[in-house]
Amino acid sequence: MNTQLNNTNKKSLLTLSALTLAMALPVTAATMLTKDNGAAVGDNQNSITAGERGSVLLEDVQLIQKLQRFARERIPERVVHARGTGAHGVFVASKELDDLTIAAPFSEAGKETEVFVRFSSVIHSKGSPESLRDPRGFATKFYTDEGNWDLVGNNLPVFFIRDAIKFPDMVHSLKPSPVDNIQDPNRFFDFFSYEPGSTHMLTWVYSDYGTPASLRKMDGWGVHAYKMINKSGDVKYVKFHWVSQQGIDNLDAKQVAKVQSQDFQHLTRDLYEEIGKGNFPKWDLYIKTLDPSQLDDFDYNPLDATKMWLDVKETKVGTMTLNRMPTNFFQSTEQVAMAPANIIPGIEPSEDRLLQGRVFSYADTQMYRLGANHQQLPINRAKVDVVNYNQDGAMNYGNTTSNVNYQPSHENVSENPIARRSQTQLKGYVQQAAIKKQQNFAQAGVLYRGFSKQERTNLINNLAGDLGKVQNSDVKHKMLSHFYKADTEYGTRLTKAVNGDLKMVKQLASKL
């Protein structure tokens, strides 16, 4: 009797299980786990073994594939600007700039252009605390009707150096030592003691501007001069400036210590949370312009990346709103490839020596990180058709069907004369020499005197914290002489803060 009941129960249970499975299949089929080739996975919890105590078998494709893919999840880290966060948005032109440029985003008032912005730290590694003192990258990709335009700048208006040939050395000095992997002020101040042009940027970085409280509450600067070209071929030099509608908010040293002890990713978290709440940050874009004939009107070189155009009026040309965060960090923020080489008709690089190097370097490093076909990735893909004969290479998923992969040919694929490079009149000789009107210290002094009393004190304390660690007396006093040359109060206070010899500082400064 018991046996009969058990068999009956078993049959009922099997019938019920089969019915349940049949009912469930249409619901779960769409979420079935698969291998990379699309084939179903039968067991993702246990490896295939030779019996209970035997070795794992090499034929376990699911195990091997998971381990292989896991070992290849990381692409090369950016040499600079490694840690970052990004957001989607829109730029709206506030006026047409036909008199200045044929660039698509400025073709008419009210014109909307989709953008992606990547904020970043410059020197520190991908997993570093966001509260560390560092310039912040502020790079914007415009998806325009004429192709992608990348405006790759920072949250500070100038840079440490003016010639790209010094860029690798500068970064090496700022990065951790190759011996012990520790970032060392002895190293980077040694380098900067030979680069008096860095005084202006160091004054910015060691002020509270070097530790922003929020990505939403900092400005962005193009840093370099660019060129704008109108339909007549007329050229104007231009500088770009993003002005935060949220205002500016920085952290002092005490606030930095408090924030870092609580949240080492406060900048990223703030951006995600605020945009998630619908508090969309906005920046107004301003430009300054100079006629080529005005370049000699200043006591400095306007194409020097260590300088600001202090006496040139700004004009508002549009507003950017960030309104959507990426749904996948890697696919968007990590794979986005910003490069000053990505320009469109109506905008060109100037003769700024640092920018000239960046035009090559940034595009090249993106090819190294992401491959030759990185511009086919969704985050980098232009909204317009890409028509050229660049072909093949790793991860190329284009579809070349024509027998003609060259130009010119009988096929009707031609150039657009409006996109030709503007003409620049040259004079002089091919040379290898520094620029003439360097003025290494004046603008650093203007900046220092423009700070409030508390901002000056914070700057001195921040600088003394690192400069006071420098063991080489010559290096320390050369640096002190640079700051003294910028402003006597600046240099005197800093010398006292690091127990320097003011008499020696004055002697060194007199020779600058």
Regions found by a protein language model. Give the residues of each.
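Active-site-adjacent core segments of small-molecule enzymes
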Residues: A30-L512
